[in-house]
UniProtKB/Swiss-Prot annotation:
It comes from Mus musculus (Mouse). The modification N-acetylalanine is found at residue 2. The keyword Isomerase does not apply. Residues 116-148, 270-292 form a coiled coil. The lineage of its organism: Eukaryota, Metazoa, Chordata, Craniata, Vertebrata. The gene is Vps51. Pfam families: VPS51_Exo84_N (PF08700). Keywords: Acetylation, Coiled coil, Endosome, Golgi apparatus, Lipid transport, Phosphoprotein, Protein transport, Transport. This is Vacuolar protein sorting-associated protein 51 homolog.
Length: 782
């Protein structure tokens, strides 16, 4: 506001507002020139007058000062500013006041809502804690009542309990004595009936008593009879175990009974594992046979079901029976079982990985994830029983490896889909156009490529999201809750594909020799717009979608969205710059050939514009249409009203003196060169390969600069006759008539074409230009 208030009365008013009218134009121009010089040297009005600039801290008209006086300020405005400026100042102040008022209201409302939310939260917490305290009080009361009842019941039953216990002891002793006297007959009957377990239990119940009272004759006779019967029982059990025709539960029962009869545990342990190995190896052989080439392999879900029900189920039975039977073996027995499980488990895992490898080429993960879920779920039980064998960890590692391979597979699929989309675009661009039927436009091709890529990305995300579904048994593992989401899906798949897409797009900026073929300029333009769209919206959308679907619980660093957007923008800039160079070189090649293949010394008097200049205008117009399909117009400088009527008088200003002077001396060209060079010193430097902005005007400006600079350099290398110079004059005027409307600043076209004509004049021994009116007639006719 202070800047607006300090504006002097001369600013903001045009020539029509000055009371002096046209007489004030000259002083006005001088004031503007002085102002530009002061702006260039960084001087203010105070510094020009000889004293340092800066607002007076005691100035009552300084809006931002501590001593601001509104009455003095308004009085100064009324005295120094016209009505129009007063109204503009009022409008600006009202706008700023409203903006400040709106900001203050927004700030108050935001903080008010936060305070209300915090108050509600605290009130809710108080209510919850009050309810908890009431419930705890009721619980303490109930516990006290229960304790009181328990004490009263125990005191009432104490006397009766002692009498009942004494009678029960006498009764139990009588039953034991009766059992001992009947033991030999019971054992004999159990062996005859095949009730080996019952016989062993009878023997176990009586063994300690018989050992304790074997010095008594009656007990000694019972013990001798029992030992004979027990020896016969052990022989039958060993025969049954060694036959191996029964199942795992029956064999485990035999070992259990033999151990109960006192047989050596070490020998039984080795025999038990040997029999179990044979059965489990049969299961592995059947699984390996399913992987053979001759029969069609079952689907992966059926394969894992068979392995889980057969091998894993059998291993669980063996492990459970072994731990129950040989627990007394201690660490040595556990190590034997762990080594046994590791060996056979490793062979089973190898078969599973071979079968899973056959699924890596498929695009659907649903069946594969279900198979991995069942595989991992079935190995929970042996993993718990055989923690030392590490079966559960090995199964998890297999699942993680498969998940990584699927991510890599989907990344390659996305890359292939992107390349396929580019191939379709190239074919569409190269396809011949039928009469009366136009092919798809660049905008349609861009929309097709963008939608196709986005569709493939969403499909891949949905496919790999199955690995983190809640119903999947391994989804709660640390890898799938953290690294899989952040480093696998986000960084490896999505960020990796976006960077690969940018690298693939940048590879089209290589020279044709490196790529094996020229890239269509339209493809460069389309890719630049695609990368720019990714920078502005698509990357943020894709990463937000990924973060929402895969709730990352990993603290490892990830690529920021801003970094990816910067890479995509840089790729778009390189592609667009390369597009400008390619199109500029195409037009430059036409201009270069047209200059180098013509004999400019013996050319005839120009009657028409050369065809190559018409072709340049046509190609530039086509490029303008092509770029306009994908990029916005851009900002142009204000165009002069006579841009199409200019007839190149700049080159003649420094040469007409030498051309029409009565005495043409050898010093004249030197003077002409000197004047031309002095004029170049004060003209703006033209950067041919300046950075290209993302708009149509900037692209066309870059192409035209390259083309006209090439024309200028070619003209400097040729020698022209009088008519050759006039032909260059006609051609340049024709180009000026049409090219100025494509560039951001028409002065750029004028300067370059002026230099072309001036260079041709310098290379001409007899520089006689054509009359501007004749040039205009020829160009209008052409």
């Amino acid at each position: 506001m202070a800047a607006a208030a300090a504006v002097g009365p001369g600013l903001g008013s045009g020539p029509g507002d000055s009371p002096e009218g046209p007489e004030a134009d000259a002083p006005e121009r001088r004031r503007k020139a002085h102002g530009m010089l002061k702006l260039y040297y960084g001087l203010s009005e105070g510094e020009v007058a000889g004293h340092p600039a800066g607002p007076d801290p005691l100035d009552p008209t300084d809006l931002n000062g501590a001593h601001f006086d509104p009455e003095v300020y308004l009085d100064k405005l009324r005295r120094e500013c016209p009505l129009a400026q007063l109204m503009d100042s009022e409008t600006d102040m009202v706008r700023q006041i409203r903006a400040l008022d709106s900001d203050m209201q927004t700030l108050v409302y935001e903080n008010y809502n936060k305070f209300i939310s915090a108050t509600d939260t605290i009130r809710k917490m108080k209510n919850d804690f009050r309810k908890m305290e009431d419930e705890m009080d009721r619980l303490a009361t109930n516990m006290a009542v229960i304790t009181n009842f328990s004490a009263r019941i125990s005191a009432t039953l104490q006397d009766r309990h002692e009498r009942i216990t004494k009678l029960a002891g006498v009764h139990a002793l009588l039953r034991k004595l009766q059992f001992l006297f009947e033991l030999p007959s019971r054992l004999t009957k159990c062996v005859e009936l095949g009730a080996y377990g019952q016989a062993v239990r009878y023997q176990g119940r009586a063994r300690a008593v018989l050992q304790q009272y074997q010095h008594l004759p009656s007990f000694r006779a019972i013990q001798d009879d029992c030992q004979v019967i027990t020896a016969r029982l052990a022989q039958q059990l060993r025969q049954r175990f060694r036959e191996g025709c029964s199942g795992a539960p029956e064999q485990a029962e035999c070992v259990e009974l033999l151990l109960a009869l006192g047989e050596p545990a070490e020998e039984l342990c080795e025999e038990f594992l040997a029999h179990a190995r044979g059965r489990l190896e049969e299961e592995l052989s059947s699984l390996e046979a399913e992987l053979g080439p001759s029969p069609p392999a079952p689907d992966v879900l059926e394969f894992t079901d068979r392995g889980g029900n057969g091998f894993v189920g059998g291993l669980c039975q063996v492990a459970a029976a072994y731990q129950e039977l040989f627990a007394a073996q201690g660490p040595a027995g556990a190590e034997k079982l762990a080594a046994f499980a590791q060996e056979l488990g490793g062979r089973y895992f190898a078969l599973v990985e071979r079968r899973l490898a056959q699924e890596q080429g498929g695009s659907d993960n649903s069946l594969l994830v279900r198979a991995l879920d069942r595989f991992h779920r079935r190995l929970r039980a042996p993993g718990a029983l055989l923690a030392a064998a590490g079966l559960s960890e090995s199964a998890t590692e297999i699942v993680e490896r498969v998940a990584r391979e699927r991510l890599s597979h989907h990344l390659q699929g996305l890359k292939a889909a992107f390349l396929s989309s580019l191939t379709d675009v190239r074919q569409a661009l190269a396809a011949p156009r039928l009469a009366g039927k136009e092919g798809p436009s660049l905008a349609e091709l861009l929309a097709n490529v963008a939608s196709s890529i986005l569709s493939h990305i969403k499909t891949s995300l949905a496919s790999v999201h199955l690995f983190t579904a809640k119903e999947v048994s391994f989804s709660n593992k640390p890898y799938f809750r953290g690294e899989f989401c952040s480093q696998g899906v986000r960084e490896g798949l999505i960020v990796g594909f976006i960077r690969s897409m940018c690298q693939t797009a940048q590879s089209f900026c290589d020279s044709p020799g490196e790529k094996g073929g020229a890239t269509p300029p339209a493809l460069l333009l389309l890719l630049s717009r695609l990368c720019l769209d990714y920078e502005t919206a698509t990357i943020s959308y894709i990463l937000t979608l990924t973060d929402e679907q895969f709730l990352v619980q990993d603290q490892s660093p990830v690529t920021p969205v801003s970094t990816l957007c910067a890479e995509a923008r840089e790729t778009a800039r390189r592609l667009l710059t390369h597009y400008v160079k390619v199109q500029g070189l195409v037009i430059s090649q036409m201009l270069r050939k047209s200059v180098e293949t013509r004999d400019w010394l013996s050319t005839l008097e120009p009657r028409n514009v050369r065809a190559v200049m018409k072709r340049v205008v046509e190609d530039t117009t086509a490029i303008d249409v092509q770029v306009g399909l994908l990029y916005e117009e851009g900002v142009r400088k204000a165009q002069s009203s006579d841009s199409s009527k200019r007839t190149f008088s700049v080159y003649s200003s420094s040469r007409q003196q030498g051309r029409y002077a009565p005495s043409y001396t050898p010093s004249a060209p030197m003077d002409t060169n000197l004047l031309s060079n002095i004029q170049k010193l004060f003209s703006e430097r033209i950067d041919v390969f300046s950075p290209v902005e993302f708009n149509k005007v900037s692209v066309l400006t870059g192409i035209i600069k390259i083309s006209l600079k090439t024309l200028l350099e070619c003209v400097r290398l040729r020698t022209f006759g009088r008519f050759g110079l006039q032909q260059v004059q006609v051609d340049c005027h024709f180009l000026q008539l049409y090219l100025w409307r494509f560039v951001a600043d028409e002065e750029l076209v004028h300067l370059l074409l002026d230099e072309v004509v001036a260079s041709a004049a310098l290379r001409c021994p007899d520089p006689v230009p054509m009359e501007p009116s004749v040039v205009e007639v020829i160009c209008e006719r052409g």
